[in-house]
Each structure stands twice: as C-alpha cells, then as structure tokens.
C-alpha cells in the first residue's frame, strides 16, 4: 500500500537519465505503433526478468518484469512473449542482446534491465529498450526509489516503453478512485476507495457509515472531491490524500452534487438543486466565492471542464430531453451538441481536448461512447444493461467505466464492476476490485 509519507518520498525520485550507449546502430525504420490508426496487431515484446546482484534483487527484478509486462499487455498494443520461449537468459543479456536468439522467437522489441540495492537503502533500476529487427538500441533510463515503491518504478518503466514506441504519453503510473459497494441492494454500503490503475495497492478511504458518490481527482492527484450524505445531508466535500482530512465545499441552501475540479485546481464546478431547480455553479477555492453559471428552468448537471479551462460540457433537459451541451466557462454561449437518438448524460472532456465521452441510453440499453467536441463523429464503445461513469486516462486514449448486471426481484445476482476500454472499442478489460465498484475516476500521472 502506498502510504502518504512514501508518496511524498517519491518526489525525491532520481531524475531520469538517458543511458549512454555509444555503439548505437544507424537510424532505420524502427519499431513503432501508430495508435491513431484504430485496431492493430499487438507488438510482440520480450521482457525478461531484471537481473540483480543478490537473491533479493533477483526476486524484485522478476516482480518488476511481471508488472511491466502486465501493464503493456493490458494496453492491447503489446503482446509479451512467454518467458519459457526465451533463449538468452537475463544475466547474459546484461552484456548485450544476442539478436538472432530474439528473432528466433519472433520478438520485435526487447527490454533488458537490472536492479541493484544501494547502501542508502534505495533500489536503483536500469532498463534498455531494443529494436530486435534493426538490432538497435531505442532508449533507456535509470530510476531509483525506496524498495516499497518498486511497483511505481515498474509503472514508470512501462510508461517509458509505451511512449517510446507509440509517441504518446503512458498512463500506468496512475491511480483510480472509485466507490466500493457491498451488501444487499436495499442496504448497500458505499465507501470511497483508491487503488493503482492495475487494481493493486487498494485501500478504503471512508468506512461506509455515510453514502458517498461521484469522486473526482484534482489536477495534482492529491485531492478528491465527491458527494457525501454526511448525517443525511448531501454535500460536496474535498478529501486530502496526504493528510486524510476533508472539508465541505460550502454550506449551501440546496443539495450540492456532481463536483469536478478545474484544470488549474483552483475551482470546483458542481450542481446545486434548490426550490425544484438544478443549476451549475463554480466555487473559487482561493476566494471561496461562488458564482452561478446556468440560469434555466431545467436540470443542468454533470459539468466537466475542457483541458484549457475555457469551456464546460454538461447535460441538460432544457430542450425537453436529456442531452449534452457546451458553454463558455463563464456560462455564456450554451450550445447543444448531441442530436442522435436516445438520451445523453455524464459528459467528460478528454485530457487531449479532442473528444467528449458520454453515457447514452437507447432502446432499453446503456452505452459508453465518444464524440468530437462539436457533437460529430459519435462512436459507441461499450454497451450493457447499465453502463455509466466514463472517465479518461490522462493520455486520452483509454476510458474506465462501470457496468452493472441485472438482479432478480429479490435483488440477487447484481454485480457492479469496473472496466477499461480503448478508443477502438475492442480492448475491453475487467478491472478487479475487492468488492463491487462504481463511479471510477482516473488520476493524472502521479507527480
């Protein structure tokens, strides 16, 4: 589990140093994945155990290779080769790859690595990425951290490989906050929970004594805003992951819900229901001043900022049905952008700024989809009896959401699980949690 002190200690990570390799072969058409071209064949990659000087280092080296391999495999872009097929062992690999051995097992990329425990108690990890076809070095880094943070080291290695091969930022050194659900349908316990993006290092942040919903990360990944029914009163709160303390966004006259941070982290946009009307408001966290952004006799909710903070996308029934609208960040110039059949809700702007994810309900089914920011190019990626809560990975190439299966008249058989899916709509994966899970929110890359 990642403790607060360990999270802070990661600020002392050694600066990533590109390994000096003098004998680099001349540049050729190297291994590359163009993830903008849709569905493609995964890249065969060999990831042997990272070699160590001691038995303890060797065990950690094997664990690091396992996590790197799992990260890359889940992306759907890489196909790690079974280690049983390896001809060259990890120890001899440190002297350099025997490329014919790796070509013989059809590897197109190769990762070599080593790990060393230092006198200061920290571990030092080196890795190199090789283009097997061209017999060329591609990149390499050196990283160090405390031994208990070996999983973060692994995720950072996977991020570096992903970026070098695809040209896009990775998303493995991240966390997901979500609502852990347990108990019968008529007495559901919901707890605010957090874990690494692969489901590891899981912990509960609240005890389930009060209902919690819709958690969202701050841009720093150190705070979470969410809705809590504390003492039966629905209010928006901000939870600090470093201190474990929480504070109310404000003591407002109506029910507040659906909060989300601005890209600079200085504001929270949210909905407030008062006197039978639901409007969108913005709270400046520095001045504690609140301003109303929508003024319409309709339900305006689920606001989400554009990455530059200049626009907000939201859902509204002002046109007679649940649809998606955009407006300027000051509330001006509202425009409807969804015009397909069905009802649209829970819009979320991509971190890249190019797409908006949403939930759609049509013909008794729910869908997770994406559209361009003007509403064009709608694509449906996932469907089910109930699928909701899309949230973007920080690179804007993967989504997480939750899917609920139907229950019988006694509430039996209901299962609520988290999933991830990429923009091709093909690579859908279950994200395992200790109990049922809903309302996921993906963090930015962890500082």
From Swiss-Prot:
Keyword Nucleotide-binding recorded: no
Listed A to Z, the keywords are: Cell cycle, Cell division, Periplasm, Signal
- Signal peptide range: 1-29
Stored Pfam families: PD40 (PF07676), TolB_N (PF04052)
Q: What is the lineage of its organism?
A: Bacteria, Pseudomonadati, Pseudomonadota, Alphaproteobacteria, Rhodospirillales
By its UniProt entry, which SUPFAM superfamilies does this protein fall under?
Answer: TolB, N-terminal domain, Tricorn protease N-terminal domain
Gene transcribed to yield this protein: tolB
Say which family it is in: Belongs to the TolB family.
> What highest taxon heads this organism's lineage?
Bacteria
- State the name under which the record lists this protein: Tol-Pal system protein TolB
């Amino acid at each position: 589990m990642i403790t607060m002190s360990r999270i802070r200690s990661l600020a002392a990570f050694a600066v990533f140093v590109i390994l000096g390799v003098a004998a680099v072969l001349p540049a050729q058409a190297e291994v590359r994945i163009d993830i903008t071209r849709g569905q493609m064949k995964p890249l065969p990659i060999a990831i042997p155990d990272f070699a160590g000087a001691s038995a303890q280092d060797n065990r950690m080296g094997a664990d690091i290779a396992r996590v790197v391999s799992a990260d890359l495999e889940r992306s759907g872009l890489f196909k790690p080769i079974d280690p049983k097929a390896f001809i060259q062992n990890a120890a001899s690999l440190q002297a350099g790859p025997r490329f014919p051995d790796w070509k013989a097992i059809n590897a197109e990329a190769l990762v070599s690595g080593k790990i060393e425990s230092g006198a200061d108690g920290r571990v030092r990890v080196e890795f190199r990425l090789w283009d097997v076809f061209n017999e060329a070095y591609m990149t390499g880094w050196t990283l160090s951290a405390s031994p208990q943070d070996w999983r973060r080291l692994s995720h950072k290695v996977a991020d570096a490989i992903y970026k070098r091969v695809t040209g896009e930022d990775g998303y493995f050194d991240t966390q997901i906050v979500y609502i852990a659900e347990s108990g019968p349908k008529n007495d559901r316990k919901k707890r605010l929970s957090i874990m690494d993006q692969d489901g590891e290092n899981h912990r509960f942040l609240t005890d389930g004594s009060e209902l919690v919903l819709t958690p969202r990360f701050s841009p720093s990944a150190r705070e979470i805003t969410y809705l809590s029914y504390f003492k039966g009163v629905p209010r928006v709160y901000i939870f600090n992951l470093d201190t474990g303390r929480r504070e109310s966004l404000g003591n407002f006259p109506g029910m507040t819900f659906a909060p989300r941070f601005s890209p600079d982290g200085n504001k929270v946009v949210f909905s407030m229901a008062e006197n039978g009307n639901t409007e969108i408001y913005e709270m400046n966290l520095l001045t504690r001043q609140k301003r109303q952004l929508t003024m319409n006799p309709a339900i305006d909710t689920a606001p989400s900022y554009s990455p530059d903070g200049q626009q907000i996308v939201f859902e509204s029934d002002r046109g007679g049905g649940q649809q998606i609208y955009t407006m300027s960040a000051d509330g001006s110039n509202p425009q409807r952008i969804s015009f397909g059949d069905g009802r649209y809700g829970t819009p979320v702007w991509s971190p890249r700024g190019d797409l908006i994810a949403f939930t759609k309900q049509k013909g008794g089914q729910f869908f997770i989809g994406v559209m361009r920011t003007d509403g064009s190019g709608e694509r449906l990626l996932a469907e089910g009896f109930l699928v909701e809560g899309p949230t973007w990975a920080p690179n804007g190439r993967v989504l997480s959401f939750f899917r609920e299966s139907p229950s019988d008249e006694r509430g039996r058989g209901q299962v609520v699980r988290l999933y991830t899916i990429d923009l091709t709509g093909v690579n859908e994966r279950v994200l395992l949690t200790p109990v049922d899970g809903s309302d996921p929110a993906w963090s930015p890359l962890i500082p």
